[in-house]
Amino acid sequence: MAKRVYAIAMRYAQALYELAKEQKSLDKWQEDLQDLSSLTEDASVAEFLSNPKIASARKHKVLAKLSNIDPLMLNLVDMLVATRRLGIMRAVSGEYNRLLNEARGVEDAIVTTAKPSSEADIEIIRQQLSKITGKKINVVTATDPGLIAGLKARIGDKLIDGSVSRRLVLLQNEISQGRI
């Protein structure tokens, strides 16, 4: 089921990306998608949009008034509502961002540290990850006190684990196997 949703979201995102590229509106559409994604995750908005008793034209007008979104983007919402796929809006937005980042040579890195990092530390991490990947890195930070110290960085499907908790697990394995 998840693969099917991803495949559908990917098709929508690819079509949107091509259209935005054609109209030279890549960044604007990225913002619009993020706004729509947040808006459609609101329970009352999702309920309103999914209500079959409310005419599509009225839904369209309300969305247009709620946001400053490109009319073509509103057509996407109309289509998702009509096909009962409004729930994939977040996936469409995420896939669009991935396509945009890929075209620009940018990769997202989720960096988790034991405690919040300073901007200077984040910049150093960004530079190091950029050297490793050869791409520009967009850092998203998270904290997990369970790491004790160090960091974990997830870039796509790769994980760089430089945490003290991971080193302790490795040390424990070495001791339990009698290597130390």
From Swiss-Prot:
Compartment(s): Cell membrane
Entries under InterPro entries matching the protein: ATP_synth_OSCP/delta_N_sf, ATPase_OSCP/dsu
Keywords assigned: ATP synthesis, Cell membrane, CF(1), Hydrogen ion transport, Ion transport, Membrane, Transport
Pfam families: OSCP
One cellular component (GO) term of this entry: plasma membrane
Physiological role: F(1)F(0) ATP synthase produces ATP from ADP in the presence of a proton or sodium gradient. F-type ATPases consist of two structural domains, F(1) containing the extramembraneous catalytic core and F(0) containing the membrane proton channel, linked together by a central stalk and a peripheral stalk. During catalysis, ATP synthesis in the catalytic domain of F(1) is coupled via a rotary mechanism of the central stalk subunits to proton translocation.
Name this protein carries in UniProt: ATP synthase subunit delta
